[in-house]
Swiss-Prot record:
UniProt keywords, alphabetically: Allergen, Antibiotic, Antimicrobial, Fungicide, IgE-binding protein, Plant defense, Secreted, Seed storage protein, Storage protein
Sequence similarity: Belongs to the 7S seed storage protein family.
Keyword rRNA processing recorded: no
Top-rank lineage group of the source organism: Eukaryota
Function: Antimicrobial peptides 2b, 2c and 2d have antibacterial and antifungal activity against a range of species.
Taxonomic source organism: Macadamia integrifolia (Macadamia nut)
GO cellular component terms, semicolon-separated: extraorganismal space
Biased composition, class Low complexity, residue ranges: 601-614
UniProt GO MF annotations: IgE binding; nutrient reservoir activity
Name of the protein in its database record: Vicilin-like antimicrobial peptides 2-3
Keyword Membrane listed: no
Principal cellular location given in the protein's record: secreted
Record domain Cupin type-1: where: 230-369, 414-584
Length: 625
């Protein structure tokens, strides 16, 4: 019917209406659970035959089905969902010229990406269940099939449990030392040695670790070709042990060079940390607009309800930003509100009736249709260099236009690297901004921390006196160990029967995790922890800490800032049931402070030799994830 029209303009409009009708009629959600693209294609063609009575309309409908299914087959040739998504987006740009068709094509890409992520997660969960079943089968095989040395170690532990609580610690240490001598040490500082309990085969069961969040814990909130926004799993939803974080969420944003992030406001207070790149932030406070250039290490707060937008003003480098949110409407839940958009995001203005909008904006329906819902490219879009220059220039005519650096009295950004390192030596550097340093952090009572640990070195052990921290790996790999008194109850009681509170046994579970880029761990207040740079490069960490005011890091080793060294010798002698000389030799042998040579370095060189230590690469050289 379209081909019989006289003018090309009428023909294009007719074809566009056919396409629109076709896409709107097909309920793609019915096919989302299909594994085989050919099955999807056949169902699509069957739908065409059922709904279209005209043979030519059936032919057109089936041709569109075939095109879509061919795209699906090409899509499935790639194993990685991210690569599939990127190829799909490129195909949309190459084949589609009409904005409507482009949007439909991109929506198909989004559906396929989410479907593949669900399949990937399902495969992971099935593998986890299979591993757990195999582990349980091994445990049911009985003592006779277990390693004699492991059986001896477990017998030793059971013997310790029958002793008085004050003697159990030393007894358990003797068991561990005995097992180490047999080459199956429970020393978690050396993953290759193996371990006991649920870590018995040398690799920790990180799925049992409520404090560890791998990259699968990140869900994609928005994604376009120009970047993506991901949010970490709800802390309190993971475990009740993380109840202190039930009102907080962690968000990671990545934007390509010359990208523009649409204006929005949140029903949550937000603290932004620039991990890499150079950006610009615009915030609207009532009728005033404030603008700030952002650099690596900048920290700034965006109050709830403040409309803001971001620009990557660099031509070559991606912009990486971490956002720490404190929710205010629903604990642990937050929402974005976009005034402009299309279908994803949908503009909140479009939810009002046209009569209301016409009256509020003093305009006509035609103007509303010409503006609202026209932006089809998503939350993060590409801007021309001319548009970037216009958005980031210092416009003297703009109201309340501020280009300034932050400080104690400023609402502008505070740069972590403008102050001296909190701790620094050849093995690492650490920077931190606390509420007492930057007034914008006081209401939320949050601190922001960045550390650079050289390859093979370690930080700690130490504990935070008041603050619980969410620590994320920006680059490198980390072996993390933490002492936790809360997890020991998971493995059952030891003495049987109900005890009085004063007779309760004190036991700490050794919690460990291996973290890679974009993975996180929660360190609760008071929990001793250590971070080891275990990869082939320096380890770069950033962290957000709650309950930050008057928090201090108490270190348990080192020449300086070591709280154990401040305990009187007589008290140490009594506490450790060892001679004063032995205690002093143990706690006074380390010449460094805060950052130390790691376990492997310590084994390769004498404790006092540092000539072979690699030079420290400054954290200022770090440019992103």
């Amino acid at each position: 019917q379209c081909m019989q029209l006289e003018t090309s303009g009428q023909m294009r409009r007719c074809v566009s209406q056919c396409d629109k009708r076709f896409e709107e009629d097909i309920d793609w959600s019915k096919y989302d659970n299909q594994e085989d693209p050919q099955t999807e294609c056949q169902q699509c063609q069957r739908r065409c035959r059922q709904q279209e009575s005209d043979p030519r309309q059936q032919q057109y409908c089936q041709r569109r089905c075939k095109e879509i299914c061919e795209e699906e087959e090409e899509y499935n040739r790639q194993r990685d969902p991210q690569q599939q998504y990127e190829q799909c987006q490129k195909r949309c740009q190459r084949r589609e010229t009409e904005p409507r068709h482009m949007q439909i094509c991109q929506q198909r890409c989004e559906r396929r990406y989410e479907k593949e992520k669900r399949k990937q997660q399902k495969r992971y969960e099935e593998q986890q269940r299979e591993d757990e079943e195999k582990y349980e089968e091994r445990m049911k095989e009985g003592d006779n099939k277990r390693d004699p040395q492991q059986r001896e170690y477990e017998d030793c532990r059971r013997h310790c449990e029958q002793q008085e609580p004050r003697l159990q610690y030393q007894c358990q240490r003797r068991c561990q030392e005995q097992q180490r001598q047999h080459g199956r040490g429970g020393d978690l500082m050396n993953p290759q040695r193996g371990g006991s309990g649920r870590y018995e085969e040398g690799e920790e069961k990180q799925s049992d670790n409520p404090y560890y969040f791998d990259e699968r814990s990140l869900s994609t909130r928005f994604r376009t070709e120009e970047g993506h926004i991901s949010v970490l799993e709800n802390f309190y939803g993971r475990s009740k042990l993380l109840r202190a974080l039930k009102n907080y969420r962690l968000v990671l944003l990545e934007a390509n060079p010359n990208a523009f992030v649409l204006p929005t406001h949140l029903d949550a207070d937000a603290i932004l940390l620039v991990i890499g790149g150079r950006g610009a932030l615009k915030m609207i406070h009532r009728d005033n607009r404030e603008s700030y250039n952002l650099e690596c290490g900048d920290v700034i707060r965006i109050p709830a309800g403040t409309t803001f937008y971001l620009i990557n003003r660099d031509n070559n480098e991606r912009l990486h930003i971490a956002k720490f949110l404190q929710t205010i409407s629903t604990p642990g839940q937050y929402k974005e509100f976009f005034p402009a958009g299309g279908q994803n995001p949908e503009p909140y203005l479009s939810t009002f009736s046209k009569e209301i909008l016409e009256a509020a904006l003093n305009t006509q329906t035609e103007r509303l249709r010409g503006v609202l819902g026209q932006q089809r490219e998503g939350v993060i879009i590409r801007a021309s260099q001319e548009q970037i220059r216009e958005l980031t220039r210092d416009d003297s005519e703009s109201r309340r236009w501020h280009i300034r650096r932050g400080g104690e009295s400023s609402r502008g950004p505070y740069n972590l690297f403008n102050k001296r390192p909190l701790y620094s030596n050849k093995y690492g550097q650490a920077y931190e901004v606390k509420p007492e340093d930057y007034r914008q952090l006081q209401d939320m009572d949050v601190s922001v921390f960045i550390a650079n640990i050289t390859q093979g070195s370690m930080m700690g052990p130490f504990f935070n006196t008041r603050s619980t921290k969410v620590v994320v790996v920006a680059s490198g790999e980390a072996d993390v160990e933490m002492a936790c008194p809360h997890l020991s109850g998971r493995h059952g009681g030891r003495g049987g029967g109900k005890r009085h509170e004063e007779e309760e046994e004190v036991h700490y579970e050794q919690v460990r995790a291996r973290l890679s880029k974009r993975e996180a761990i929660v360190v609760l207040a008071g929990h001793p922890v250590v971070f080891v740079s275990s990869g082939n490069e320096n380890l770069l960490l950033f962290a957000f800490g709650i309950n930050a005011q008057n928090n201090h890091e108490n270190f348990l080793a080192g020449r300086e800032r070591n709280v154990l060294q401040q305990i009187e010798p007589q008290a140490m002698e009594l506490a450790f049931a060892a001679s004063r000389k032995e205690v002093e030799e143990l706690f006074n042998s380390q010449d460094e402070s805060i950052f130390f040579p790691g376990p492997r370095q310590h084994q390769q060189q004498s404790p006092r030799s540092t000539k072979q230590q690699q030079p420290l690469v400054s954290i200022l050289d770090f440019v992103g994830f």
